[in-house]
């Protein structure tokens, strides 16, 4: 299995948006994966707006649905958005997780095909 994209998401709660430049850089430099952030909010914070100007396909703004907490929306969209990414093999991750070892996220997947669902948790 060859991952083609990593997907992370966040909203305005916490400092998660400010982590994305490092998260994007680490996924690319360690695993050679392109990382995309989905931000749930009415507008992008400056850090993501600036990043989007450099890497237009790396940041997506998702306007929040009314009466549903944006943190919950960010969690759900990260799980559901890959269904819209045709012809991609997507690894979903938390915004505050960066790869430290290529073997864990690249070589470990070599024995799987794109029809498999692989989880890195025991839940």
For the regions a language model picked out, list residue spans one by one.
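N-terminal anchoring/stem segment of glycosyltransferases
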Residues: 1-67
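Amphipathic coiled-coil/heptad-repeat helices and related helical stalk/stem segments
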Residues: 19-20, 44, 75-78, 101
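Surface-exposed alpha-helical segments enriched in charged/polar residues
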Residues: 25-29, 80, 110
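Hydrophobic/aromatic beta-strand patches that form the interior of the parallel beta-sheet core
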Residues: 36, 91-93, 118-119
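Short, surface-exposed basic-aromatic patches at helix termini and helix-loop junctions that form
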Residues: 52-56, 84, 107-113
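A conserved donor-nucleotide-binding helix/loop in the catalytic core
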Residues: 65-91
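The conserved acidic donor/metal-binding loop of glycosyltransferases
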Residues: 94-98
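Conserved donor-nucleotide/metal-binding helix-loop-beta segment in metal-dependent transferases, i.e.
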Residues: 100-123
């Amino acid at each position: 299995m060859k991952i083609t994209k990593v997907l992370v998401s966040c909203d305005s709660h916490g400092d998660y948006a400010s982590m994305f430049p490092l998260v994007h850089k680490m996924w690319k430099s360690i695993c050679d994966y392109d990382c995309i952030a989905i931000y749930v909010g009415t507008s992008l914070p400056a850090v993501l707006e600036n990043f989007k100007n450099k890497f237009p396909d790396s940041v997506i703004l998702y306007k929040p649905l009314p009466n549903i907490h944006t943190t919950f929306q960010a969690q759900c969209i990260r799980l559901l958005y890959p269904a819209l990414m045709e012809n991609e093999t997507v690894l979903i991750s938390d915004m505050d997780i960066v790869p430290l070892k290529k073997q864990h996220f690249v070589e470990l997947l070599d024995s799987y095909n794109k029809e498999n669902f692989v989880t890195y948790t025991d839940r």
